[in-house]
């Protein structure tokens, strides 16, 4: 029995790129392939709509939190695509999602972009908004020498926008914010950027302006920003924080990456039964093991804790690559056949750029030394314990 005989493999080979969301084929792929965990339907999507619907109260900017590759850009892209084109509502493969997003469908114009790191946030934001305004013949110019507050200028910009498009709102979306803020903090400029974030969030209240961005972790709790804690609290008051949870990532793995019929689940359940005595939690969590098979449930939990290597931490892409290697293999009756998080280190070792990170190089050099000693002194399945310890060491230095 091969892996591909007991599940439907739908690989995720790339994360959503904002700069391609204007391409129709790309849009349809993003709309059709979105997976809807219950938490998205119960909380995340309703919160988006609440903060976007015209005439709402206490509306704020939107901060979407999730590790690399967990679907932040896909989630924001989905909302934007429906908001800018009502026809896209019918392309959603979930009836409840269509009902939730009906109030915002086709109500907005959208400008999305990825942050460059060589300028101040206000200069970048006003440049991008100006580019949008000029392309739509909206009569407003930002003055870089203006003494008006950020909020005043945003208000004037929206007034000009609504003069031209009275029935539309305006969404400004940034793909990733955290790395930009970290670099600004390193250069001593963070405190000048936080008032801009505050103003952008505040501009969303009782207007048709929506500002959203993605981050890998809450900017308020990032330890490198705590020297600006007072200002961060003011920023926090202006944003809704929508977090993609570990359970949501597991759901995407189950329903899109490694989907299974009930008959296939029964086969997997029978395959795993002989191994339950060897896993402390398998008996009580057999359905979790079955639904995620062949991924060990602890893989996702440990994977997201590793803070090294941006591209390597794209969990859905990483699992796609790892399963692609074994999909045509026979499943041994003598082994559970699980993808465990120790295999992740092997993949990282193949990335030459990782050696530029001194922490990773230290772990790598130590592992090679231990490997050599074990190879020369022991026999049998002894290296697997070392592989297990490798990502554990990375967790301690992340």
Residue positions per predicted region:
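Walker A/P-loop-proximal flanking segment of P-loop NTPase domains
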Residues: 1-70, 82-83, 230-246, 250-260
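P-loop NTPase catalytic cores that bind/hydrolyze ATP
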Residues: 77, 123, 168, 172-175, ...
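Conserved P-loop NTPase mechanochemical-coupling segment
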Residues: 109-152, 178-187
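Conserved P-loop NTPase catalytic core
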Residues: 99-109, 114-119, 198-330
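Flexible phosphate/Mg2+-sensing switch loops adjacent to catalytic phosphate-binding sites
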Residues: 58, 80-109, 137-152, 223
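Conserved P-loop NTPase "ATPase switch" module shared by AAA+ and STAND
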Residues: 162-190
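Walker A/P-loop
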Residues: 73
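Single conserved hydrophobic/aromatic residue that forms the stacking wall/gate
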Residues: 386-387, 391-398
